[in-house]
């Protein structure tokens, strides 16, 4: 089993959650330990090399099959690239989870790091 940190359409209440994560174990809400930049250009994405805000999201425990399905959705490794990062859960616990990064910035910056704050 692996942990995956989701910050956009895979979060509960968004369009990709049910098809991809409805059977996965919810670990908790949290944010990245390090700062990154979130942009929206139709869909949200996070850029690793810009240090603007902690990214807000949810952590799920996923099996290999689910991780591969998410890789396919995200176009890993050709579109998004996943990398393990430290996540601080709202409970205070720190865990390592996969996060999908986009290689370049474009679109509208979400300064809060929370896709739910985007009003595009």
Swiss-Prot record:
Family, per entry: Belongs to the gamma-glutamylcyclotransferase family.
GO cellular component: cytosol
SUPFAM superfamilies per record: Gamma-glutamyl cyclotransferase-like
Keyword Lipoprotein: no
Active site: residue positions: 74
UniProt KW keywords: Acyltransferase, Transferase
Organism field: Methanocaldococcus jannaschii (strain ATCC 43067 / DSM 2661 / JAL-1 / JCM 10045 / NBRC 100440) (Methanococcus jannaschii)
Protein name: Putative gamma-glutamylcyclotransferase MJ1514
EC class name: transferase
GO MF: acyltransferase activity; gamma-glutamylaminecyclotransferase activity
